[in-house]
Structure formats: C-alpha cells, structure tokens
Amino acid sequence: MRLLLDMINWSFYNKSLVRRGEVILDFDVIDSWYSELDSMNDGKRGGQYHYPDSFIQLLGYMRVYFHLPYRQAEGVVIAHAGNKIPSIPNYSTINRRINNQDIRISERHEVGNDDDIIIALDSTGIKVANRGEWIRHKWHVRRGYLKIHVAVNIKNKKIISLEVTSEEVHDGKMLKKLIDNASANNNVKGALADGMYDSNKNFRYLSKNHIKPGIKTRSNSKVKTGNCQARNRSVMRQQTNLKRWKHSVSYGQRWMAETVFSSIKRTFGEYVTARKFQNMAKEMLLKASLYNMFAIGM
C-alpha cells in the first residue's frame, strides 16, 4: 500500500480533482447559446427549443453530482446565470429536457483512431431508492435494485458501453449488446469477464468478431465435441495452467471494471433518485458520462 501511494503523482492528482469543480460549474456553454439554438431549431417542426442541449446537460451533471432536486437546480441557474441568459427554465422544464437528452458516454477514444483496445465486462447493483433500512424492516418492503452492465477500456478506465436492466437479467446475456455498442467507436480486440459470461453463445460471438476471449470458464467445464471450439481451447488452457492463461489474456486487468463501480458509487452514491425506469437509466448514463470526464482524476 505504501508503495502504491508513493507511485501517485499527487500534484497531477490534486489538479485533476480541482478540475472537476470547473467541469461541474462550467457556464461557458452560455457563450454558444444562440448559435446552438439556431442549429437545434433548424428545420424543426412545432415548438422551438428555448434552451440549448449543452446547457441542459450541464444542469443534469450538477443534479447527479450534488444530488440536487429539480427545484434546487432551478435555483442554481437563477443564482449563477440568471443575468446571463434570456430566460430561466423552470424545474418542470429542466426535468423534461434532462430526461429527453441523448446522453453519449462513448466517443472515439483519445489514444488514437486505429488503436486496438481490451475491455473488461462486469455488472453491479444500484439501489432504486435511498429510503433507509428502517422502511424495509417496518413495512417489509423489498427495495430492489437496478443492474448496471458496463464495458470498460482497461487502458484509461473509461466506460465505453453501458446498459441498465432490472435485477433479473443475467450478466451473460448482456455481452453481445455491450460489445456491439463498444465496437461502434472502438476497435475491440479482447474481452475480459468472469464466469457469469461463460457460454458457448458468447464464445461463438467473440470468435466470429475476432475478439480474443478472456472469460473465466466454470471449474467443472468439459471439452465436448458440440461445444464452441474457442471455448474448448479456453477450457483446456485454464485446466492445464490457469496462471499462465490469466497472464496470456491479461485477466488481472478485469478488476478495472470493479474499480469503475467503486469510483462511481463513491462519487455519486449507491442509489438513483428517479422513480421511472427510463429516467433511472438516464440518471445512470449522466453519471457514467460525468465519470468519464473525471476518469483521469479517479
């Protein structure tokens, strides 16, 4: 632990944390207010937009970071930008526009357009309400949780694909969708995942797309003729020398996904405040998008 602390560039780390405050309260988006609105309303039928997307997304970031209700978000606008913008959006407008935003968490990665990347897949649970344990004990209400499925670039710890589902959805069923989304903007050449993703279907998908599998197979797995050959090879290699297999696929880097979950929960909390499922998903996308902006300081 002491060695790890000594390796951290504390000056750089501190500056990156300071930068978070600049990102959250960056009202410079106001400078492009009219040009952005002109672009958004060009060719639009019906009612016109009165507030640019970049401004609404900034309010969304402030909400999830500071845990602000919509009315307080309106108050922040009045206090910090009231004399700089033509009109103040009321809390219902902020609510509607934030939950209708197209939130993108993955653009072309900065390392280089042609770089190959390895991703780590995993999921975690997020509470659907922060009501306290006493309610569950007194009223016997099962709070439930969402499942957040992610694909993380192990090189920079950024989320490049995210899906939100109910708790009943099995991790393994999300592999294809996560990688399809990740591959839209990245050259995915390897995928690391635990035994929850172990299936012939997933191995066939990875093989078809020329993605090196780094999936931990079940301990009782057998090599069978009808199985996917890529999975059979992984089973044999893991049963012959598990340590060598882990080294060959960089399996130890799978913990990057767990690090991301830890950072998100520590930064934004372990719950969502929205009540509707689609709004819960939007809230998590906002958190993931903001996490990516913060990632260098995590």
PLM regions: where:
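Helix-centered, glycine/charged polyanion-binding patches within enzymatic domains
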Residues: 1-4, 195-266
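Basic, amphipathic alpha-helical segments enriched in Lys/Arg and hydrophobic/aromatic residues
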Residues: 53, 61, 242-298
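Double-stranded DNA-binding cores of transcription factors and transposases
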Residues: 1-11, 15-16, 54
